[in-house]
Design a protein with these regions (language model features):
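Short, compact, well-ordered microdomains
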Residues: 73, 78-113
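Context-gated lysine
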Residues: 2-5, 12-15, 46, 55, ...
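Residue-level signal for the start and early helices of compact helical domains
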Residues: 21-23, 38-40, 86, 91-92
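A short, structured beta-strand/loop element
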Residues: 28-78
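Signature of extracytoplasmic/envelope-associated structural regions
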Residues: 4, 17-19, 59, 101-120
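Short, charged/polar N-terminal "headpieces" of proteins
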Residues: 1-36
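Aromatic-residue detector
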Residues: 14, 30, 43-47, 84, ...
């Protein structure tokens, strides 16, 4: 595992680790660990994404949409509290937009008869 580096990813409290060796064009395993100076990192979460097409490999991990929906749910709960804010509302909208584009991709693959397979 190596540390994930992204422009907007903060490492103030946690670090995200990503597998280095993977198949099917993208990493499948991620970990979120504590990032406290002088302390050994504790694993807070392990995420295992789907490895390979479902029709060929079966369901063996979470999909992108699962995690996006979790974040939307969490932000919607904040929006029902004293922590409601414009930034959360915009983030929800953008995450919902991401779900729309991912759904559009799936629909297009279904129409071509290749959804759930390794075919393009």
């Amino acid at each position: 595992m190596k540390e994930l580096k992204r422009d907007l990813l903060t490492t103030k409290y946690t670090k995200v680790l990503v597998e280095e060796n993977y198949q099917f064009n993208a990493p499948h395993r991620y970990e979120v660990v504590t990032n406290e100076p002088g302390c050994y990192p504790d694993t807070l979460a392990k995420i295992h994404f789907q490895e390979g097409p479902i029709k060929e490999c079966g369901v063996n991990g979470v999909c992108n949409e699962d995690l996006i929906n979790m974040v939307i749910d969490r932000l919607e709960h904040f929006q029902q509290s004293e922590f409601a804010c414009r930034e959360n509302a915009i983030a929800i909208t953008k995450l919902e937009e991401a779900l729309l584009w991912l759904r559009k991709r799936t629909i297009a693959r279904e129409q071509r008869g290749v959804e759930g397979t390794h075919s393009v």
